Amino acid sequence: MTIAITGASGFIGRRLMKALAGGNHNIKVLSRHAGTNLPPGVQLYVWDAMKGPPPELSLEGVDAVVHLAGEPIAQRWSDEVKQKIRNSRATGTRHLVQALSTMSRRPSVLVCGSAIGYYGSRGDEVLTEQSAPGSGFMADVCVAWSRKPI
């Protein structure tokens, strides 16, 4: 299977990339940083999700896309950073979907992840996909992002 991963330099993306690269998969990484440290055989395509759709070659022949790109959340949340977090989820996803929509052979699967913050801090409560969103900044970002038409 050929899998494209955005956000492969992030906390989840790094681990996912390494796990998939260790299997029998072809991995294409879309990253803002050309110097990203990649496992052998992983193809790198430079893409800034805020500036426009990814390069056509980065998605050519891809069976699945895992979209994890976005402004890092592990930093101090100033008003400016909060706006970057909001914008990076919506704009990056829109640019990716725009590119996918023009392809003659589209990937079978698009998985997007924004933040576990959707559920908020609920202690020992067991959460499922049917659980309501939590409260707070990240929950609000996730809810707004998931409601954006793509």
PLM regions: where:
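SDR active-site strand-loop-helix element
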Residues: 6, 30, 65-69, 110-116
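N-terminal Rossmann NAD(P)H-binding glycine-rich loop of SDR-like oxidoreductase domains
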Residues: 3-23
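Active-site Tyr-X1-5-Lys
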Residues: 135-150
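Conserved glycine-rich Rossmann-like NAD(P)H-binding loop of the short-chain dehydrogenase/reductase
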Residues: 25-32
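Conserved Rossmann-fold NAD(P)-dependent oxidoreductase catalytic core, especially the SDR/UDP-sugar
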Residues: 84, 94-136
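Rossmann-fold NAD(P)-dependent oxidoreductase module
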Residues: 15, 19, 99, 148
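Residues at the starts of beta-strands that form the adenosine-phosphate
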Residues: 2, 26, 108-109
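NAD(P)H-binding glycine-rich loop region in Rossmannoid oxidoreductase-like domains
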Residues: 35-92
